[in-house]
From Swiss-Prot:
Pfam families: BBE, FAD_binding_4
The protein, known as: Carbohydrate oxidase
Cofactor(s) it depends on: FAD
Residues in cross-link 6-(S-cysteinyl)-8alpha-(pros-histidyl)-FAD (His-Cys): H92-C154
Gene3D superfamilies: 3.30.465.10, 3.40.462.20
Cofactor, free-text remark: Binds 1 FAD per subunit in a bicovalent manner.
Main location: secreted
Nucleotide-binding as UniProt keyword: yes
Gene source species: Microdochium nivale
Annotated thermal dependence: Optimum temperature is 50 degrees Celsius.
E.C. code: 1.1.3.-, 1.1.3.5
Catalytic EC class: oxidoreductase
Function per UniProt: Catalyzes the selective oxidation of C1 hydroxyl moieties on mono-, oligo- and polysaccharides with concomitant reduction of molecular oxygen to hydrogen peroxide. This results in the formation of the corresponding lactones, which typically undergo spontaneous hydrolysis. Carbohydrate oxidase is able to oxidize a variety of substrates including D-glucose, D-galactose, D-xylose, D-maltose, D-cellobiose, and lactose.
Glycosylation sites: N244, N417
Length: 495
């Protein structure tokens, strides 16, 4: 009885402390003129719902920022009251890191800041607010200026998390990662200062922002180099019909050889299977269907027999964004529908030898027997001789995977009205482990935009940032020594 009473008293005290903290932070925000989300309102209910409903967290308060000054004041209030701060742009983090990955943060909700502030038609540089989502930014740049940037395929993803950690999509082989378009930023630091960062100003901070940006501050303005929106693209697909392990092994190895040595910049593609047991190739080609067929024929000539080339579709830029969005529109200014899932990733220099054998064995022997929910894998061609991603070295930005040919996403989803079972984590864990055990540690990593929150902080930052981790730890100690922008897989400050 006594222990139960002490436990209950502790819970009451903790709850009271949380209320006091919430009252204090909301009072500070209000005094500074920062809009806040009030519990029970529609805004609060929208902003507190995570994309991955498996990982709900409750912030101490939500600052609904609408200006750079609001962001600055929010960080200053958090510093004053010794609260951790997390910035949420689109809210699409697989690990709910926009909430802080735990309860009790001050959440800076950025998605009321969605404007393209300015565009310079001489330089092609656009200044963009941090809460815009990819589809909205693509729509505005295309419709108003006839311009584009390289980015991922999910239109509801916020630009800030996407850009800050790389940003891969069906334009990356042609135009590089989303982060490669970043030429400057306006950042609110942990001490509340507002600074500019670029290749010539605060260059060390700029380096860290380009690949590990969530660790150092909140970007209030992204300055992006755009390119002319393409007028002719081709959506293509190939049904592979791999009926046995031998054909799958030969097929993946054929794709690897083509991707590494032959595939021109214009070919952006992946192998994917969406739980049906029949993988295919899908992608975008920057040019006409006839040009795609000529460019892709060397791969078709080496694939195992039985494949079927699907009809192609000619698209303009914004149609191509819509084509792979899985929605009927792309101009998202509110969150995407929620899901209930666990995901993992790999970045690989190669998937030949025992690595591909283990991948295929697991696919046929384990994965294809999982029939009670939706799962998928995507083997994206990330690097290769002609990939624009590899034209930048690992040392030039904080993004450390440019020497990797493959970016793989593994995704396991239950219905939203179900509970993701503890016993199901072993499905993807086992698949990833089957591959990595066959490779030296230097030949693989993981991608934080497909975050796996079950990894501890030190292991996660090692696989996310690889050879750049030590430099990032020193930058963290310089710009955020008290870990104000902490989340469970944030870089540690180490002097």
């Amino acid at each position: 009885m006594r222990s139960a009473f002490i436990l209950a008293l502790g819970l009451i005290t903790a709850s009271a402390d949380a209320l006091v903290t919430r009252g204090a932070i909301e009072a500070c925000l209000s005094a500074a003129g920062v809009p806040i989300d009030i519990p029970g309102t529609a805004d609060y209910e929208r902003d507190v719902e995570p994309f991955n409903i498996r990982l709900p967290y409750i912030p101490t308060a939500i600052a609904q920022t609408q200006t750079t000054a609001h962001i600055q004041s929010a960080v200053q209030c958090a510093k004053k009251l010794n609260l951790k701060v997390s910035a949420k742009s689109g809210g699409h983090s697989y690990a709910s890191f926009g909430f802080g990955g735990e309860n009790g943060h001050l959440m800076v909700q950025l998605d009321r800041m969605i404007d393209v502030i300015s565009y310079n038609d001489k330089t092609g540089i656009a200044h963009v607010e941090p809460g815009a989502r990819l589809g909205h930014l693509a729509t505005v740049l295309n419709d108003k200026y006839g311009r584009a940037i390289s980015h991922g395929t999910c239109p509801g993803v916020g630009i800030s998390g996407h850009f800050a950690h790389g940003g891969f999509g069906f334009s990356s082989h042609m135009h590089g990662l989303a982060v490669d378009s970043v030429v400057g930023v306006t950042v609110v630091l942990a001490d509340g200062r507002i600074v500019e960062a670029s290749a010539t100003e605060n260059a060390d901070l700029f380096w860290g922002i380009k690949g590990a940006g969530s660790n150092f501050g909140i970007v209030a303005v992204w300055k992006l180099a755009t390119f002319p929106a393409p007028k002719v693209l081709t959506r293509f697909g190939v049904t592979l019909n791999w009926k046995n392990k031998t054909s799958a092994l030969k097929g993946i190895e054929a794709v690897e050889d083509y991707a590494r040595w032959v595939a021109p910049r214009e070919v952006n593609f992946r192998i994917g299977d969406y739980g049906a047991g029949n993988p295919g190739i899908e992608g975008l080609y920057y040019g006409t269907p006839e040009q795609w067929r000529a460019a892709f024929q060397p791969l078709l000539d080496t694939l195992p027999a039985g494949y079927v080339v699907n009809p192609t579709t000619s698209l303009n830029w914004i149609e191509s964004v819509l084509s792979y969005s899985n929605f009927d529109h792309v101009d998202f200014i509110t969150p995407q529908p929620v899901e209930n899932f666990y995901a993992k990733s790999l970045t690989l220099k190669s998937i030949k030898g025992d690595a591909v054998k283990n991948f295929v064995d697991y696919y046929f022997d384990v994965s294809n027997k999982v029939k009670d929910r939706f799962w998928f894998y995507q083997l994206d061609v990330h690097g290769g001789k002609n990939s624009q991603v590899t034209k930048v070295t690992n040392a030039e930005t904080a993004y450390p995977h440019r020497d990797k040919l493959w970016l793989i996403q593994f995704y396991d989803r239950y219905d939203n009205n179900q509970t993701y079972p503890e016993t199901s984590f072993k499905f993807l864990d086992g698949w990833v482990n089957s591959v990595t055990k066959a490779l030296p540690k230097s030949d693989w990593g993981m991608y934080i935009n497909y975050a796996d929150p079950r990894m501890d902080r030190d292991y996660a930052t090692k696989v996310y940032y690889g050879e750049n981790l030590a430099r990032l730890q020193k930058l963290k100690a310089k710009f955020d020594p008290t870990d104000r922008f902490y989340y469970p897989q944030a870089v540690r400050p180490v002097k």
